Amino acid sequence: MNTIDRKSRARFAAAAIVTIVLLACVARLFAGELKRLAAIELPGPSGLRFDYLTIDYDDHYLFVTHLGPGILYVLDLRMNKVVKTIEDLPGIEGVEYVPDLKKLYTSDWHEDKIGVIDLATLQVIKKIPTESKPDGSAYAAPFHKLYVSDEIAKAVAIVDVTRDEIVKTLRFDSETGMPQYDPVGKKIYVNLQDQNILATIDPATDSVVGMNPVGKCRGNHGMALDSEHRRAFLSCEQNSLLTVFDLEKNEPIAYLPIADGADVVKFDPGLKRIYVACYSGAISVFEEKDPDHYRKLGDVSVAHAVHSIAVDTETHRIYAPEQEQDGVPVARLVIYEASGK
């Protein structure tokens, strides 16, 4: 082989390597992107804070809480249209769908009550007093109980949904963050965000059966579960980490950087994607390669103050309410689709 051939082949090999690296980078960037599909203008006042969202897959409804004016929007996901506006829910934060009773429960901070909504009429039928700042909630279906974090009261209120009454209040030495129900382990998990602890509640006895440190995570507030693979995903708002927690070993196994102001976490098991809504103006996107390995796909730029999202696990669409755009007050819901799905 002459010198010219060797040099040509070397240049070709180098170019091929560069091309492969660039394609890999582009593929990774593309995989982390969210494609904006539509924006729905909401009828409430602009520039005021939104909070949790949840989906009723039976009726194809999306429920969006508008904390500022105390409004709940009901959207038909088949038409991408607001079909009902429910008012008189002062400071509404949390919202949880109870499918077996066709009811919806709201956490109404400004009056410290849990609202009960009949989905047949889309009317508020009862308000249940709590102690101080009801926030996130989780439904344990086999036990017919709703677990509501009473954040400032440092407690979890337990509601018997067959009677719509609080049957027990569990107290902690910490403000309580988002709870989640694990249908595989049949446990409720609650973030104790002042102590960096993940508490475990047994719904059969309504007793605390575990108090486990979350390692380097500081201010664990948001949470999503991959129950099948025994994993919890915790947003750490004080030090901008996503912590992956092993629910069998009761210990963290991975930490990944997220954008500032982390709040709500959602998991799409079909795409193996984890989404974290961050107040600074980003949705951090991660991939679960397998239960022990994770990688960050990117921080997708969205409007400032977007801190809550819903993920439709059937269509893989992401719903994010916006209260401002480039400093201009708005009230809208933006629909995204995951790229590379």
Task: Give, region by region, the residue ranges found by the protein language model.
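Low-complexity intrinsically disordered segments
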Residues: M1, A16-I17, D118
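Bacterial N-terminal signal peptides
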Residues: A14-R28
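Sequence-pattern detector for short linear motifs
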Residues: R9-A14, A31
